[in-house]
Amino acid sequence: MHDIVILGGGSGGYACALRASQLGLSVVLIEKDKLGGTCLHRGCIPTKALLHAAEVADTAREGENFGVHSTFNGIDMSKVNSYKDGVIGRLYKGLQGLVKSRDITYVEGEGKLVAPNAVEVNGQRYEGKNIVLATGSYARTLPGLDITGRIMTSDQALTLDYVPASAIILGGGVIGVEFASVWRSFGVDVTVVEGLPHLVPAEDEAVSKAMERAFRKRGIDFKVGVRFQSAAQDAEGVTVTLESGETLRADLLLVAVGRGPRTENLGYEAQGISMDRGFVLTNERLATNVPNVFAVGDIVPGLQLAHRGFQQGIFVAEEIAGLAPQTIDETGIPRVTYSEPEVASIGYTEAQAKEKYGEIDSYEYNLGGNGKSQILGTTGFIKLVRQKDGPVVGVHMIGARVGELIGEAQLIYNWEAYPSEVANLIHAHPTQNEAMGEAHLALSGKPLHAHA
């Protein structure tokens, strides 16, 4: 019998396997598709590769602004996809080598939980003192909306071999705005349809409104607070009807309405595991109601992020090894949307902080006062939220490259830093990171390149 049998080789599963192996535990890692899961093959990595290609396209267009003679002459999707697949391939090869170098039994095939301590794959049974469920997620659709032909999810959109003339995107969350950003840079006429009142609705309202202004400026059309009714496709394109009666027409429809847990027909319910709408329920130590069965990643309710999966996988390995690791604060997990402009945040929004703490202070530092942001030609801001006379409880940013600032932001939040403590740290000039220091100087009552 093995110490751990892990079902699923995505971010959560393989992180658990690697850490458990480091700790001297015997590990079986089972994956039906490719090691690395959604993030590496159909999510984070390929989308960010497309977003970088989009940034290069925009740079070519804007060269004259900097005195550089450059023009944008179109997109060759076969070369874009070759670049994207090359990035994936190199990372995949590296990950395979990493798993192979550890004492991990890697099993290819579709596994099913057949007992509280056993998974069956290809007719073979693997028993473990502990089971870790890490089967990930799939791209959702809406009832009655079949994914076929010109109606697609991110899975199909990532392998498109042409640039559509126009696209409708159903969903204005992270996936929707990232694809809107890529396609607009590639020259596509894009319309985003979002049922909630704002784009990126999970973000602080100030950030959502700034994103909407930026999208208007980029020529990305969007409709918020409107509901989808139906879609019909023909040889030329897709017609989308909204509940308001308005119809939209485009070459294709991207359904970006979130991701669902991949837990059907895997034996979870049959073994008595508590579920809710397909998600596996756990306590704060990621243990299910069945002894010695744990769950990590997208099947656990909460943020569906690869780095959350990594951390949960490491946590469970250490928990099983008896190290009693510190529980994970979900609010302290950084969130980044890699559109143009980028959005990055951690902690509570202003509205959430008011609800939780009552009295708060907030401050927005405009990137207009930041030298490096002026050099890059970006606009945006860093918004800080603090408890009244207390630590910083939220950092919310929008602007080019602000995702690179989230590292310091997550230290500030997770170490419960006061604005005055961050203000005393010296930030290099001229960097965008300097804006983080300036924001904290201002919030602690001693603004430098900012109005109080």
Report each predicted region and the residues it spans:
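A conserved FAD-binding loop/helix module that cradles the flavin
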Residues: 203, 207-210, 296-352, 429, ...
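N-terminal Rossmann-fold NAD(P) dinucleotide-binding loop
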Residues: 13, 176-177
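Glycine-rich flavin
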Residues: 2, 18-25, 30-164, 191, ...
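Beta1/beta-strand and adjacent pyrophosphate-binding region of the FAD-binding site
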Residues: 1-10, 163-173
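Short hydrophobic core segments
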Residues: 5-7, 111, 126-136, 169-170, ...
